[in-house]
A protein has these predicted regions:
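The feature captures the beta-strand-to-loop junction immediately N-terminal to the Walker
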Residues: 40-42
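Conserved ABC transporter NBD signature motif
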Residues: 63-71
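Conserved ABC ATPase "signature" region
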Residues: 70-71, 118-137
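ABC ATPase NBD coupling module
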Residues: 72-88, 112, 118-119
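Short coil-to-helix segment of the ABC ATPase nucleotide-binding domain corresponding to the Q-loop/switch region
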Residues: 99-108
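Conserved ABC ATPase signature
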Residues: 140-146
Length: 146
């Protein structure tokens, strides 16, 4: 659902932490629609955390996070996947979605950027995983392999 706002991403008073350890406190940010935006700052400043919150990999403890007018934390799995297809994120390190399987991480660009039938996507992904010795890890999350 499109918002009339010129901002595609809106964070309002966002808070996130691990247990009693705060990582982000009261972050407010708007990312304009149709613009390339960079998050820059010191190591440990929360840049990757902000991106993972926007991508729905983490859930904020409080505050509001809208993507195209929709609260990210209220999106279903399918809606979140559809929203991610519209996002372009490049992390300095790592390029995997932490909350989907190894198989789905490899399949993601094929599903997004081609019109291949799912049976062919499956075959290609399994061949790629076999080539790097990860076929047996296809159902694991990235954090479950080293």
């Amino acid at each position: 659902m499109s918002s009339p706002s010129s901002s595609l991403v809106v964070l309002r008073d966002l808070h996130f932490g691990y247990g009693e350890r705060p990582i982000l406190e009261g972050v407010t940010l708007e990312i304009p629609r149709g613009k390339i935006t960079a998050l820059m700052g010191a190591s440990g400043g929360g840049k990757t955390t902000v991106l993972r919150l926007i991508g729905g990999q983490y859930k904020a403890q409080s505050g509001s996070l809208l993507f195209d007018g929709q609260e990210v934390s209220h999106l279903s799995h399918d809606q979140l996947y559809a929203a991610r297809r519209r996002m372009g994120m490049l992390f300095q390190f790592g390029a995997l979605f932490t909350d989907i399987s190894v198989f789905d991480n490899v399949a993601f660009p094929l599903r997004e950027h081609t019109t291949l039938p799912e049976s062919m996507v499956r075959d290609i992904v399994l061949m790629k995983l076999e080539a790097v010795g990860l076929r047996g890890a296809r159902d694991l999350l990235p954090s479950e392999i080293s």
